[in-house]
Amino acid sequence: PTIVPEASYTPWSRTTLPENVTLLCWHNSSRIAVAVVVTLAFLVEIEQGNEVAVVHIPVRGELPARLGPSVKALPEYGPSIMDASVYRDPTRFELERERVLGRHWMLAGRSEQVQGSGDWITYEGHDECIVVVRQGDGSLSAFHNVCRHRGPAIVAEKTGCGARRFSCPYHGWVYDTKGKLVGIPEREDFGTDHVADIGAIPVAVGEWGGWIWINLAGPDKAVPLLESIGPDISNDLGAFKMEDMILHDVIEWDVPINYKAIIDGFNEIYHVTELHHSPPEFTKATRFASFHVTGDNFMCFVPRPVSLEELSSETYDHHRNSICHYVVFPNTVFNCNPEHIQVFQPIPLSVDRTKFLCWELIYPGDMNDPEYAAYHKKTMAHWEVLKGVVGEDISIYDQMTRTKKSSAFNEQILSEREFKIAMYHENMDRKIRD
């Protein structure tokens, strides 16, 4: 996101997208906030053309039905009231840092970012700094980017290639790519017991779906990654084969709001009619959505408007005919269209500040192939629209920033279709108590 000087923006601009789709944008002087006039339903109808054989087409196959007459749309939870202090209590945030963010799996990046031996990336958030390094045998190692001597970051750069060792820029302590301390200048001046067999503190690391996941609890205490994701999501989300996709774009926002407020927006679809100006067809489709609780995580499936008449079929394929939405506790959201995927990750920086990442994944192919070129053109058009939709979300975060400490904001009134918000925070409460 670019901070635009007040005198340097045009109030309205027009961009012509493929397929004669027109997108109107209004640029705010403090942040580019996009008002999408193109309706999602119209774009979805455009997408329903011939399937492109040159890319992977996710299909339900033998997986359980997630939409249709035999599927219960909502669990029995009901409306509720929720205390608003969860967004602004600094003591609670410190407990979340320790007992939630410090014990659960979180995304650190894409596997393709560290393809070669010695390639590394860093993860920074909630006062932690982690290095992830590809080893010569193809495995990954991860450790806290903190020198054991006096505490500065061992690795200054956020990413790099082909490292064999890392040297702390302060006093030159040297670590190998697994975080083992292998060199201390003037070692004889240190107490032997103080520097024997020490190294950077290790972090649990794993790969699934083409993503790198880390767990700050460490290799000995972290639950297995796939156990945390759970079989329902690993199988259902796995049908999209994210490991075969490529990273097209990453957008980052610095948002002055609690990270859980961002997750809340992905745990309901009640807002899409008003905030995203969704037309009646899409609003109708959201009423047929199904919501599923699976362990600590959630799944939601919204049928595309053009497929509503097929919902009566027991063989309805939600992968090909709906938007598939997965929330992996505590802060990872997968928004899957059949053609491409957006991954949202709000990383807390403090109790009321969040680094909000949006990753766009597409299927690879040859741009010289007319079929793939058509797929790419259509997908990029949709991505431009979705960036506008996220811009609308950002505009609401701005409004929430104005009122987050107001004496009038003490509780939230939640409908039964917002039950995932209540359950998410109940789950957070349990993790803190445990």
Residue ranges and their predicted role:
Residues 108, 154, 181, 409, ...:
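Short clusters of hydrophobic/aromatic residues that line enzyme substrate/ligand-binding pockets
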Residues 113-218, 224-232:
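Rieske [2Fe-2S] iron-sulfur-binding domain
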Residues 53-158, 203-206:
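N-terminal pre-ligand scaffold of iron-sulfur
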Residues 1-2, 8-19, 25-31:
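Low-acidity, Ser/Thr- and Arg-rich intrinsically disordered low-complexity segments
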Residues 134, 139, 145, 204-206, ...:
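C-terminal catalytic domain of Rieske-type non-heme iron oxygenases
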Residues 103-113, 184-188, 325-330:
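Short Pro/Gly-enriched beta-strand edge/turn motifs at strand-loop
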